[in-house]
Structure formats: C-alpha cells, structure tokens
C-alpha cells in the first residue's frame, strides 16, 4: 500500500482546472533572462605606423571605404575621417590630395546623408587649410562643385550651394578665379535655355527663361531666392577681389589704402646715422631680390579660362545681357503688376527678400562695371539698354515698404522664414530702397539730368526724408545712403538742391550718440565734399553754408571730446589740419577760439590724447593765426609738466621759434602773431620748469628729505625726480638753442638776467633742475658783449655752492640722483670758470667757522676738487689768499682732533697747485 | 677749351655793399658783384646764361642784370605782388615766379604772362624745374608739393582748371625747400619740411620713395648729381647726410668707432637756409641764418672755408660759370623784353597784336624744302626706276612668276587630296 501510494506520489496527475493558472513545470526552461550582443566596434589590432581614429581605422582604410557602394559605409567613413583629422591635424597636410579628391567626389553622391557628411567635413577642413595650400587642388574642387551645381538631381543642386557657401567664405580669391564656369551654372540653376527653333536666331538675351520645377521641396521662388543670394555673395567676392587690385573709388570703397606704402621707405635719421638702417632706394642696385613679388610662372587658378571671366568689359556685358532679363522676371514674379497697384500698403516678406536680392545682384554688377569702365562706354551702354526697363518695373512704385504680416498667416510665414533664415534673417526695406536708388542714380549723370529729372527728384526726396527722419541707421544703410547722396551732389549743378542734401546729412550728424562707424562715415562724407569744393579754382569756389558750419564746429567738438574717443579725435584732427594748412578762414577763427581749451595743460586734448595725435596737435600750432600770451603760458605749462614727452616738447619749442619774429627774414615780421615779449616770457617760464604757484609752495618746505640744506648758503635745494629732471634738461637744450639764435645776444642775455633777478632771486628753496638749467643757459649765452648784472652774482654764488654741496654729499646708494651728478657738475664748473666773480663770491661766503663740523669735510673736498679742475686753476690762483684763509680756518677748527685724510689731501693739493706755482708763493709772500 | 669754372653765387638779406656776389669755388677769389636791392630767399635765378634775375625781398619786382655788365641794373620786372620764389627753365624759355599763393609763368622771348596757376592754398615757398624743363615742382606753406607738366600747363584751355600731375600731401608742416634730381621726367624730387622729415618722390610715378625723420625741422635740402647722398640742413645749423645707396658688402669691413658722427656737418650756429653740391660731388656749400657761407669737404665732413656776410644768407649756389659771365665783350643774344603784368588774353588791346603772332617752327625752311607731294613723286620715280631696272636686268622674272604659280597650283591639289582622303577616313565608321 505504502509502495503503491508512494508510486502514486511519484506520478501524481496534476489536475488542471478551468480558470486556474497552469502550474509551472519543474523542468521548464527559464526564458526570463535577457541577452545582449557583444558589439566590437574597434579592431583590437593596433597599427603603430599610422594614427587611427576611435574605431582604429587609419586614413587608408577610411579613404578606401569611400569607394564602397553602400551609402552608410561612405557616411561613416566621412564621419570617421572628420574624427581622425580633428585628432591628428598633421594628417591633413600629408594626405591633402587624397582627402580632397575623395571628399569632393561625393558632392554628387545620390545619398543625401553622404552629401551632408561631406559638406560637414568640408566645413571642418576649410579653416584648417590655407589658401596657398589648397590652390593646386582647386581646379579639382571647383570641377566637382560645378558638376554638382549642374546635376540633374535637385537635391544635389541644393547641396552644392552649401559647398559654394563654404568655399566663398574661406577661399574667395580662388573661387572668383573660376567665375566663368560658375556664373553660367548660376544662370542654369534658375533658368533654362530656350532651344525651340524660332528663338535660335534671336539674340541670346531672350533665349533664357526662368524655369519652374515642381519636384523641388521648396517653392520656386524660395529656390530662386537661395540662388540669387549665393550669386550676390559670389559677385561681392568678385568685386572685393578686383577692387583690391584697382584703385577704389567712391565713398563705399573708401578703404584705407595708404598711398604707396608697399615701396616707400620710412626711416629714422638716428638709426640711419648709427648704421642700423640702410637705405636702398634704387631697385636695380639692390643686392637682395624683391621677395614680395606676386608674379608666378604658372597660373594656378585659371587654366585657359582667363578670357571668359568678368574681367573684361565685353564678357561682363554678355553676362549682364543674360542675367538682367532673368532678374527682371524674378522681380515681376515677386511683385506682379496687377498686385503692384496695392503696393502702397507694403510688400510681404518673401517677395521683398527676392526683390532685395535682385537689386543686390544688379548693384554688384554695376559696381563691377564701374571698376572696369575707364571710358564710361559701359555706363552709357547700360543706360541705353536698361533705363526704360528699370524705370518701368522698379521706379513706378518706388518707396517700398514692408507689409505687417497678419495674425492668421503667422504659421505659414514662420515656415517660410525657417527656409529663408539662412539667407537673410531680417528684411530691410530701407536698404532695399537705398540699393534701388543707388542703382538708378548711377545710371544718371550731369548731362542727362534733364531727361531724368522726374525720378531723380523722387529719389532725392526719399533720401532727404530718410536723412532727416532721424531713424537709427546702421553703417551699411548709411553707407548706401551717403553713396547715393554723394552721387546726387556730384551730378547736380543746382546749388539749392545740393545745399538741402548737405543740410539733411548735417541734421543726421548733429544727433547725439551715433556709433563710431556711422560718425566716421559722416565725417568722411563731409571731408570729401570739402575737398571737392577746395579743388575748384577761386572764381568757381562756392562755400556751402552748412559745410562751413560743420567745419567751423570741428575745433570745439575736438575740445569737448577729450580723451573719450581717441579714434574720432584723430579723424577730427586730420580734417582740421588739412583745412588749417589750406588757410580756411572760418576754421582758423574757430580754432583760435577753441585753442585755449585744446591746449589746456590739465585736461586739454593735447595732453590726454595718444602721442600720435599730440604730435598733430602740436604741429597744428604752426597754423594758428595768433598766439596770445595766455595760450603761450598754457603751452609752457604743457611743456613743463612732462605729459607731452620731451621730444614733442622740443618740437613745440621749435615750432614756436619758427613762428616768432626771430626766425624769419627781417622784413617778414608778423607782428600780430606773437609779440617778442610773450615769446621770451614763454621761453623763460619753460626754462624755469616750475610755475609761480609751485615755487611759492616750495618756499615753505623745510626738513623734508627732498630739501637739501646747508649752513653756508642761504639757498636750499629741492630735489626733483629723475624723470622730471631729465625732461627739464632736454627742454632746456631746446630753449637754449632758441635763445642762442636770437641775433642780439647781449639783449637777450639782459632780458634773461632781469627775469631771473625778478622771479628767482629772493627765493630760498630752488629746485635743483632749475638751478642747473639756469646755469646752463647762462654759460651758453654769455659772450664778451654781455654785461652781468651785479645783483645777480650773490644769488648765483649761493646756488652754485648749494648745488656743489648737494653733489658732494650724494651717497653712492642714491642711484636716482647719481645720474644728475655729471650734468650738474659740468654746469657748475663752467659757470665758475666763465664768471670768476661768482667763484670769488662763493669762496667769500665760505665762512667755515659758522659751518657745522659735519660740513667741514665737504668744504675741504670741494676746495680740493676745484683746485684739481684745470679750467678753474687760474681763477683759483687769483683767489689764492682767500683759499689759503679758508684752509687755515679749517685747520684751526680741526686742530683739536686727529688730522684726517681729507685735510691732508687738501693741504697737499694746495701746496702742489698754488704754492708750487711759480707766481703763487711770491704773491703770497708779498702779501704776508 | 678748359672745363667751365665752378663759381659760387651768394646773396644775403642785408645787401650793404652789393646784392649778389660771385666767387670762385676753390680759391675763394671774388670775381663779380652785382649791386641794387636785396634778393629774397630762393629768389635768385640765372636766365639762359645771359641774365641774372633776383626777386626782391618783400617788394613786388624782380631785378635783372646782364651777367657781364655787373654794375648796371638792366631792368626791373614789375610783378603783381611780392615774389616769394623764382626760377627759370634750363633752356631759358620760361620764367616762373611764386607770388603769394599763385605761380606765374612768363615766356621770356615775348614777355607774355602765359598762365597763373593757383592750386596752392598758402604762399609758395619754392619752385624748381626738372633738368630738361619738361616738368616743374612747386611747394608751399600749405604743406603741399605739386608736380606740374609744363606741356599740359601751357596747352590747357583757360576754361578748364589746371591740374598738376601729382599732388604730394604727406608733409604735415610747411615745406621749406625742394631739390629736383637729375633725369628730366624720370627725376626724383627731395622735399624738406618743418615737420622734421625729408621725403623723396618720383616724378614719373608720383610715388613716395623715402621718408627720413629727423630730430628737428629741416630747412634746406639738396642731392649730389649722382644722387648717392641727400644733404639736409637742420634748423639748429647741423647738416645731415643721408646715404641713398647702402653697400651691404662693406658692412663687415667698416669698423669705425665714430660712425654716427660721420654723417653730420657741424659748424653753423643757426638754421641752414641753402645747400648746394658741386658737380663732382666733393664739395658742399651751405648758407645759414648765422650770416656765413661755409664750404665743406663731403668725404671728411670738414669745413674748408667760411665766408662771413653782412646778413642772413638768402641764396648760395654752386653753378657752372656761363661763358658770358667772365667775358666782358659778351652781348646777350636777345634783349630782355618787357614782362607783362597781366595774363595774355585778358589784356584789352591784346587781340590786335596777339592775333598775328602764331609762330610755326621751321617756317623759314619752307621755301627750300619740297612739299610732300613733290617728295612722293620723287619717291615713286625712284621706285619705278628700280623696278624697271630689275625687270630689264633679269628677264627671268616672268618665268619665275610662272613657276611659282605652278607650285601654288600643285600645292592646292595636294591639299584637296589630303582633305578628301581624311574625310573618307573619318566618315567610314559612320557608314
């Protein structure tokens, strides 16, 4: 039983009931685990020879994958290539030829993803490859590009534009070299040639018509917009490239082209004199080849297509003939004549964009034609062929406005905007109108003014209103606007109209807070008008009132501008300088009025601006009609204060000398310019180096480390900073020269003397630089005709002693003042040699019994040095008794203590130079 | 005949004893003096080797002396205003004078005032002709230097504004002196200015070749004939030498401790007003406001001689003495005409005399020379006679012509055959 039961246990039948879950079998396979495939994206092998990317594929593998039939492989190869090249940029140089040939080949790939990857790779590569590196491969690149542009598949055509964008951005010079093919491609992108037989015989301009392709993803208008945007970019690059070669003309292209800087040499005389700079003016004598030559034996960019691009007027004419009818068609499509009636309320965004691109292309074509057109034949041809068309289509509804988009259509427009954001994200109806005016105005000239007066008048009104409207214009709009105005002014003989235009520009100029580029443009515009006016001869010269008001306001503006905007100040100074050198009366009058502000030593433009502008301002002084005393005193402050730089200060003194009555020929005295008194007082105050206030302030200084005091001299020395000292010294040189060249030497010496005795004698604290400079000037000016004022001598003697005392007590460690030593010693000794009476007075003042014991060694050393100095020896000899007396006094004072070294030296020197002299002892003996 | 003597012509502003003195360059011997008036700066000119012209300082006339009759003032040319500078064309046909801001151009043979150029905005300070007289350069206190072509100035119609060939506006302060180099229209012009620079320009291209910046305003400039050096006189009396040709090969050999002093002539105490170099380039003459004229050896930079005058030196120049200067028997080939004060054509009675004065060069030869028609006939005769002679000389000619025609025919045939053959070849595969 048990056995049976047991067996029953073993093979118990499981009863399955409806509604209950089936119990799991014990031997059922568990299927609840999850599996994952092991994915090995990278090879384990490590190639040591070539760098690899993340997937361990080297450049050869990747390039060979490019030939794979599958789009996915190609795409991944392109991505891998990008990865590899970003990690190892040096591969680019090594394999450029292979990379480019493979990458450009897939511009025409059927798979959109592959093309996208190729474009991305190109985008990545382009900034890394320089123009001269890619130029040998550029024929290949452009061949692939043009095959993509002319491809039958629309997608490839669209993507080719992206490639073109990249190339235009990075290699404008190279791509414009292939213009003959590319321009044709552009035309073919938006149109097709009529091949029907009836049209064959007609001229080619009619044989192209706009094409509509229903298969495109975008509307044909958007497509055209895209193509036209690229075309205008391309033409822009072309125009830029050619304007670099030719001399630019007009306000738009006023890039700073420094006149012939390439071959003119600028050198500094000092460098040349030191043989640091050699001059080689004549090219044939040069031993070095001229390396900056642009000449190439082989023409790399354009192989045999030179005769077809737009560089010749004939080809340009041909292209214009093809493209302009197409553009007009585009315009009509964007703005159908039946809708045009309602144009007053505005044009919608998208047509406006098309219109703008159309006008852009035309204006660029005009610009190109102007660059090539020397004889104005092209201009008249353009006028003949297109004026009527343009007038009819463009001008009939001239000022175009943007229509505000209504709410219901917002969704729609958003979508279209998304397409167009690449091209131009904001539509600028003002720019559109201005471009149109530019195009139209360039078709007219002075001789045809009669016929065109109606539409010219419209444009003029529009321009004037825009200028006066006070709207915020950006520099691009303003550039166009001023270009149109300039052209209008040029061809308009009528003065009132011109005056109105200038006035309108002036109202714009008067606005506050204009941006610098805008302000610069306006200034350039005015200066151009001014120069044009000045070119006319006197009879025909007509002074525009607004213009002269503008010009007259410049000095005041400059003075108010201060240091806020140095660039603007530079421009203003340039114009003022030009006008002043041309002796423009209004300007000079205003400059005179503003001079006190400009040349203010505290915050005038002359001290706050950078050095370049300072120099121009200093030069401007030459042209001032009069130099009154107050201006001169300011200028002398400017010179002294050291904010002008010593070389510039010297220049200033030189210029003033040139304007003074002493430089000219005797007859040409301009007495109204600057009186001699003012000039001399300028020189003297510059010589002093300190203003009266500063000097009086100095008088109260005592016991400061900067003041040197001795017990033997009433004059205290104020020690100046080394910088100030050297600056003062440099200026003194210039002042000295100015004084020296005054013909009546004795008179100028007298004036200098009386000035010193009036302003400096009686002061107790004197700056060391002032004392030194006065000595220097007196030494240089003194000659046999001059009579020295008696009252001056004691002052000079005490100054001299103070200086010498200062020099002898200088400590070795004081590096700053040590540099002064040689200069000061030289002037002191020379003044003592030139004026023996000063020496005598100084020796007399050495009452050693009043001196402090510390000062005695200094006096001893001084006497020894004076004795040793050869030029002074004879004078010392005449004062031998005095010297002997002083030495005797010192010896008695020192007798108590031990004989020191300096005293021994002094005794020795005295005995050698004076007692040893043949006459010396006899005189002494006679006296004793 | 010996080489012409080099002499120095000087004037000073005082003019106490004489207004102009001529002395021999090397010996310093006084040769001639001219009396009357004070010559102004840059106002001395030699006309055609026969007359000496001196613009008077601050006065509105020009003195003219015959070169050999030194003591006698020949003529006073009245001008509309004080003359600031004066020059004459090298061929002696024109006189240029700067009067205020205008340039006056006279024709010497008639004395007519041909043109008044007013492109300067302030006083003209110096005027120079190029060596061949085809161009002249003017510079003024308005910082501008203008290069004019004489032809275009003379031919322009009065209605149009006369434009200079080049406008050089890089100077920023008044130009004080200019020197025109050798080479006619290819010459280089050096200008000196108070803005402390000396600039060198090319007349042919109008380019700025060189600009040298100094420490002081430059008041005079000159070049030697070979244009190896520019000499620049500074406002403090130093004269600087700028070498235009560097010799890179020499740089290793030249070790001179005092190199930087080797390019300055020091001696004058006031601004140098005029400079001149002798034709061999070895001697430099300088005149200064310190009332002295100095002669320097260019190579060693030493002062050879100092001549002290009575006033600031206004003009000093080394010239080759024209034969008339030293020959008392010499008479000028042309009497100096009366110089007109008014522009030709603007005068009232001008049409009456001016109408018939159209000169045609070579007119006096017309009688002797055959006309062009006659010449043509002559030429034809010569040609035909030559042809006839050839024909007669060789009877072969017709035969030769025949031969050649035959050859042409055969060549044509071959060409046609070739064409047929090739078309056959080409068209076969399409068959």
Curated annotation (Swiss-Prot), chain A:
* Any GO CC annotation of this UniProt entry: mitochondrion
Q: Which InterPro entries match?
A: ARM-like, ARM-type_fold, HEAT_type_2, Ipi1_N
**What PROSITE patterns does the database record attribute to this sequence?**
HEAT_REPEAT
* HEAT repeat copies, ranges: 99-137
- Phosphothreonine modification, residue list: 29
Chief location of this protein? Answer: nucleus
Q: Which UniProt keywords apply?
A: Cytoplasm, Nucleus, Phosphoprotein
Its subcellular locations are: Nucleus, Nucleolus; Nucleus, Nucleoplasm; Cytoplasm
The similarity comment for this entry is: Belongs to the IPI1/TEX10 family.
Q: What does this protein do?
A: Functions as a component of the Five Friends of Methylated CHTOP (5FMC) complex; the 5FMC complex is recruited to ZNF148 by methylated CHTOP, leading to desumoylation of ZNF148 and subsequent transactivation of ZNF148 target genes. Component of the PELP1 complex involved in the nucleolar steps of 28S rRNA maturation and the subsequent nucleoplasmic transit of the pre-60S ribosomal subunit.
Quaternary structure, from the entry = Component of some MLL1/MLL complex, at least composed of the core components KMT2A/MLL1, ASH2L, HCFC1/HCF1, WDR5 and RBBP5, as well as the facultative components BACC1, CHD8, E2F6, HSP70, INO80C, KANSL1, LAS1L, MAX, MCRS1, MGA, KAT8/MOF, PELP1, PHF20, PRP31, RING2, RUVB1/TIP49A, RUVB2/TIP49B, SENP3, TAF1, TAF4, TAF6, TAF7, TAF9 and TEX10. Component of the 5FMC complex, at least composed of PELP1, LAS1L, TEX10, WDR18 and SENP3; the complex interacts with methylated CHTOP and ZNF148. Component of the PELP1 complex, composed of at least PELP1, TEX10 and WDR18.
Could you tell me what this protein is called? Testis-expressed protein 10
The record lists the organism as Mus musculus (Mouse)
Q: Which gene encodes it?
A: Tex10
Swiss-Prot record, chain B:
Give each disulfide bond as a residue pair: none
Q: Does the keyword Phosphoprotein apply?
A: no
Q: InterPro entries, per this entry?
A: G-protein_beta_WD-40_rep (IPR020472), WD40/YVTN_repeat-like_dom_sf (IPR015943), WD40_repeat_CS (IPR019775), WD40_repeat_dom_sf (IPR036322), WD40_rpt (IPR001680), WDR18/Ipi3/RID3 (IPR045227), Wdr18_C_dom (IPR026987)
Subcellular localization is given as:
Nucleus, Nucleolus; Nucleus, Nucleoplasm; Cytoplasm; Dynein axonemal particle
Enumerate the WD repeat regions by residue range. Answer: 36-75, 78-116, 119-158, 170-211, 213-257, 267-306
Q: Which Gene3D superfamilies match?
A: YVTN repeat-like/Quinoprotein amine dehydrogenase
Pfam families, A to Z? WD40, WD40_alt
* SUPFAM superfamilies, A to Z: WD40 repeat-like
Per the entry, what this protein does is: Functions as a component of the Five Friends of Methylated CHTOP (5FMC) complex; the 5FMC complex is recruited to ZNF148 by methylated CHTOP, leading to desumoylation of ZNF148 and subsequent transactivation of ZNF148 target genes. Component of the PELP1 complex involved in the nucleolar steps of 28S rRNA maturation and the subsequent nucleoplasmic transit of the pre-60S ribosomal subunit. May play a role during development.
Subunit info here reads:
Component of the 5FMC complex, at least composed of PELP1, LAS1L, TEX10, WDR18 and SENP3; the complex interacts with methylated CHTOP and ZNF148. Interacts with NOL9. Component of the PELP1 complex, composed of at least PELP1, TEX10 and WDR18. The complex interacts with pre-60S ribosome particles.
Q: Which family does it belong to?
A: Belongs to the WD repeat IPI3/WDR18 family.
Per its UniProt record, what PANTHER family does this chain match? WD REPEAT-CONTAINING PROTEIN 18, WD-REPEAT PROTEIN 18
> What name does the UniProt record give this protein?
WD repeat-containing protein 18
Q: Which organism is it from?
A: Mus musculus (Mouse)
Q: What is the lineage of its organism?
A: Eukaryota, Metazoa, Chordata, Craniata, Vertebrata
């Amino acid at each position: 039983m048990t056995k049976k039961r047991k067996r029953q246990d073993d093979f118990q039948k499981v009863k399955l009931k409806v509604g209950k879950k089936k119990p799991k079998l014990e031997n059922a396979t568990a299927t609840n685990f999850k599996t994952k495939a092991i994915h090995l994206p990278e090879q384990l092998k490590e190639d040591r020879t070539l760098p690899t990317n993340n997937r361990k594929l080297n450049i050869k593998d990747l390039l060979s994958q490019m030939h794979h039939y599958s789009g996915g492989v190609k795409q991944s190869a392109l991505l891998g290539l990008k990865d590899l090249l970003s990690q190892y940029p040096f591969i680019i140089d090594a394999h450029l030829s292979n990379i480019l040939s493979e990458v450009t080949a897939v511009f025409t790939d059927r798979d959109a993803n592959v093309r996208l990857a190729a474009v991305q790779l190109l985008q990545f590569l382009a900034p890394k490859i320089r123009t001269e590196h890619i130029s040998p491969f550029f024929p290949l690149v452009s061949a692939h590009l043009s095959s993509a542009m002319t491809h039958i598949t629309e997608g490839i055509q669209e993507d080719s534009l992206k490639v073109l964008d990249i190339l235009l951005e990075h290699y404008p010079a190279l791509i414009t070299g292939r213009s003959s093919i590319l321009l044709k491609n552009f035309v073919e992108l938006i149109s097709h040639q009529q091949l029907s037989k009836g049209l064959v015989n007609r001229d080619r301009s009619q044989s192209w018509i706009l094409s509509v392709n229903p298969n495109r993803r975008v509307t044909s208008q958007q497509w055209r917009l895209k193509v036209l945007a690229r075309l205008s970019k391309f033409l822009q690059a072309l125009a830029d490239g050619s304007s670099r070669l030719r001399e630019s003309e007009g306000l738009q292209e006023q890039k700073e082209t420094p006149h012939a800087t390439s071959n003119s040499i600028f050198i500094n005389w000092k460098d040349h004199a030191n043989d640091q700079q050699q001059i080689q003016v004549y090219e044939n004598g040069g031993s070095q080849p001229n390396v900056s030559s642009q000449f190439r034996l082989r023409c790399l960019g354009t192989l045999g297509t030179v005769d077809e691009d737009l560089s010749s007027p004939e080809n340009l004419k041909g292209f214009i003939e093809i493209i302009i009818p197409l553009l007009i068609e585009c315009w009509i499509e964007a703005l159908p004549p039946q809708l045009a009636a309602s144009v007053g309320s505005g044009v919608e965004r998208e047509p406006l964009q098309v219109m703008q691109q159309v006008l852009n292309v035309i204006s660029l074509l005009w610009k190109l034609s102007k660059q090539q057109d020397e004889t104005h034949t092209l201009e008249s041809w353009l006028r003949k062929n297109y004026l009527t068309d343009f007038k009819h289509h463009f001008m009939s509804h001239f000022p175009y406005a943007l229509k505000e988009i209504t709410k219901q259509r917002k969704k729609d427009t958003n979508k279209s905007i998304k397409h167009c954001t690449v091209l131009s994200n904001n539509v600028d109806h003002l720019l559109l109108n201005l471009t149109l005016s530019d195009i139209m105005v360039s078709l007219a000239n002075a001789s045809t003014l009669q016929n065109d007066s109606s539409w010219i008048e419209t444009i003029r009104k529009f321009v004037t209103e825009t200028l006066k409207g006070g709207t915020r214009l950006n520099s691009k709009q303003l550039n166009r606007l001023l270009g149109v105005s300039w052209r209008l002014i040029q061809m308009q003989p009528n003065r009132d109209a011109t005056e109105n235009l200038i006035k309108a520009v002036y109202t714009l100029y008067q606005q506050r807070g204009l941006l610098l580029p805008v302000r610069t443009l306006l200034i350039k515009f005015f200066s151009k008008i001014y120069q044009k006016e000045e070119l006319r001869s006197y009879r025909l010269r007509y002074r525009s009132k607004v213009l002269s008001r503008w010009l007259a306001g410049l000095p005041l503006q400059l003075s108010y501008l201060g240091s806020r905007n140095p660039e603007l100040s530079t421009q203003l100074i340039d114009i003022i300088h030009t006008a002043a050198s041309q002796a423009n009366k209004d300007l000079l009058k205003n400059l005179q009025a503003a001079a006190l502000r400009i040349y203010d030593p505290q915050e005038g433009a002359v001290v706050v601006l950078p050095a370049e502008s300072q120099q121009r301002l200093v030069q401007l002084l030459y042209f001032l009609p009069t130099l009154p005393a107050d201006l001169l005193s300011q200028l002398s402050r400017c010179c002294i204060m050291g904010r002008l730089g010593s070389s510039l200060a010297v220049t200033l003194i030189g210029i003033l000398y040139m304007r003074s009555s002493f430089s000219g020929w005797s007859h040409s005295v301009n007495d109204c310019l600057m009186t001699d008194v003012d000039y001399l007082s300028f020189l003297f105050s510059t010589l002093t180096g300190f203003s009266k206030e500063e000097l009086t302030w100095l008088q109260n200084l005592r016991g400061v480390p900067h003041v040197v005091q001795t017990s033997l001299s009433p004059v205290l020395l104020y020690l100046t900073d080394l910088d100030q000292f050297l600056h003062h010294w440099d200026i003194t040189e210039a002042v000295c020269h100015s004084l020296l060249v005054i013909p009546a030497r004795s008179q100028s010496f007298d004036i200098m003397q009386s000035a010193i005795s009036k302003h400096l004698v009686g002061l107790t604290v004197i700056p060391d630089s002032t004392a030194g400079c006065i000595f220097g000037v007196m030494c240089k000016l003194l000659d046999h005709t001059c009579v020295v004022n008696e009252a001056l001598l004691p002052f000079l003697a005490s100054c001299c002693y103070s200086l010498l005392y200062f020099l002898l007590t200088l400590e070795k460690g004081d590096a700053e003042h040590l540099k002064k030593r040689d200069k000061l010693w030289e002037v002191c000794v020379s003044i003592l040699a030139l004026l023996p009476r000063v020496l005598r007075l100084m020796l007399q003042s050495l009452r050693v019994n009043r001196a402090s014991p510390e000062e005695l060694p200094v006096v001893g050393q001084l006497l020894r040095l004076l004795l040793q100095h050869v030029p002074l020896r004879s004078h010392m000899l005449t004062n031998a008794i005095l010297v002997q007396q002083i030495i005797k006094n010192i010896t008695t004072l020192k007798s108590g203590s031990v004989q020191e070294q300096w005293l021994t030296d002094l005794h020795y020197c005295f005995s050698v130079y004076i007692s040893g002299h043949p006459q010396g002892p006899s005189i002494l003996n006679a006296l004793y | 005949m010996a080489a012409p003597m080099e002499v120095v012509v000087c004037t000073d502003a005082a003019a106490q004893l004489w207004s102009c003195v001529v002395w021999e360059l090397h010996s310093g011997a006084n040769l001639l003096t001219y009396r009357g008036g004070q010559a102004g700066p840059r106002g001395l000119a030699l006309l055609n080797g026969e007359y000496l012209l001196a613009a008077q300082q601050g006065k509105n006339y020009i003195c003219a002396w015959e070169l050999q009759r030194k003591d006698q003032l020949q003529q006073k040319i009245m001008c509309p205003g004080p003359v600031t500078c004066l020059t004459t064309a090298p061929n002696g046909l024109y006189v240029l004078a700067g009067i205020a801001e205008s340039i006056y151009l006279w024709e010497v043979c008639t004395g007519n005032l041909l043109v008044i150029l007013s492109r300067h905005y302030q006083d003209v300070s110096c005027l120079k002709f190029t060596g061949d007289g085809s161009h002249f350069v003017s510079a003024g206190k308005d910082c501008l230097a203008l290069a004019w072509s004489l032809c275009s100035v003379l031919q322009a119609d009065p209605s149009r504004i006369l434009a200079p060939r080049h406008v050089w506006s890089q100077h920023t302060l008044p130009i004080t002196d200019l020197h025109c180099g050798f080479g006619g229209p290819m010459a280089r012009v050096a200008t000196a200015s108070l803005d402390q620079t000396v600039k060198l320009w090319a007349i042919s291209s109008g380019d700025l070749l060189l600009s040298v910046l100094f420490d002081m305003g430059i008041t005079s400039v000159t070049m030697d004939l070979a244009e190896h050096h520019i000499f620049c006189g500074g406002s403090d009396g130093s004269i600087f030498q700028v070498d235009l040709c560097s010799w890179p090969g020499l740089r290793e050999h030249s070790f001179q401790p005092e190199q930087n002093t080797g390019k300055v002539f020091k001696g004058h105490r006031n601004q140098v007003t005029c400079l001149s170099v002798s034709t061999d380039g070895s001697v430099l003459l300088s005149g200064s406001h310190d009332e002295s004229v100095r002669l320097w050896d260019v190579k060693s930079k030493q002062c050879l001689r100092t001549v002290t005058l009575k006033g600031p030196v206004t003009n000093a120049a080394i010239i080759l003495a024209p034969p008339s200067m030293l020959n008392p028997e010499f008479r000028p080939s042309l009497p100096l005409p009366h110089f007109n004060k008014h522009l030709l054509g603007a005068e009232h009675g001008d049409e009456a005399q001016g109408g018939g004065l159209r000169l045609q060069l070579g007119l006096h030869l017309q009688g002797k020379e055959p006309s062009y028609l006659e010449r043509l006939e002559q030429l034809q005769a010569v040609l035909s006679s030559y042809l006839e002679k050839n024909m007669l000389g060789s009877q072969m000619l017709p035969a030769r012509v025949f031969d050649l025609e035959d050859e042409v025919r055969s060549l044509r045939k071959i060409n046609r055959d070739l064409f047929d053959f090739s078309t056959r070849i080409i068209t076969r595969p399409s068959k």
